[in-house]
Amino acid sequence: IQSAAVITLALNVVAMLKQEVRRPDLTDHARARPTFGTAWQDFITLPQARRLLWALGLGTMGFTMQDILLEPYGAEVLGLSVSDTTLLTAMFAGGMVVALILTSRHLGKGSDTIRVASTGILIGIAAFAAVIMSAPLQAPALFQIGAALIGLGNGLFAVGMLTAAMEFGGDKMAGLTLGAWGAVQAAAAGVAMFSGGAIRDLVTGWADAGLLGVALQSPASGYGAVYHIEIALLFVALAAMGRLVRRPGEVGENG
């Protein structure tokens, strides 16, 4: 733990050395600046701005509701040891790293950012299906593969949507667009993590009380309900992103 803290401190110091220098022409207090309300109104009236934020929020919730549930699911439903459940975090992070590498290569070749994000959603849907099926099959390996694929899909979606936001508003609205992206992503993630835990506890209580029938009187029922909701959210996000995809010959939404 101490080694990780030292490495984190060192990386932050290195990052500070490469920060962009302040530009006096842009930070001059005499420079005319629109109010936040005016700037926000200009942004939100852009074509597809609301759709972009809705797709981001729904997709983020779809990937994040499981955030606090994967490890207890592995232990309670599949009987994994502490070391095995801890390994899930590494597998999830490994999927994210692979996603960053793949995204860098594809976007560097001019791939559409929304298509990249959509690919991440499709991978996420398959990943949650694998996690769900690992319970009745009692297949820890399938569960671990699903966890890694969740990381991969989440990484592709997050980077794809972030890059789309950077391109969306053009140079004049880049800062506001990224701020909106961050606010929606953080709010959706917070709501998703709370909702995931609450829904799991609620459905598990119903299952234990026999309200869902004998077939669902299992510890997996609460987790499964959350994973099915996540799949539904990802499908809705995918549908919302359809009209954001660039058509052949288009440079960008506002390019």
Kindly label every feature range from the protein language model.
Residues 20-53, 255:
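Juxtamembrane intracellular "pre-TM" segments in multi-pass secondary transporters
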Residues 156-170:
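Intracellular juxtamembrane helix-capping segments at the cytosolic ends
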Residues 1-6, 201-232:
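A membrane-interface helix-boundary motif in multi-pass transporters
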Residues 98-115:
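Helix-to-loop junctions at the C-terminal end of transmembrane segments
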Residues 82-83, 169-184:
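Loop-to-transmembrane helix entry/capping segments in MFS-fold secondary transporters
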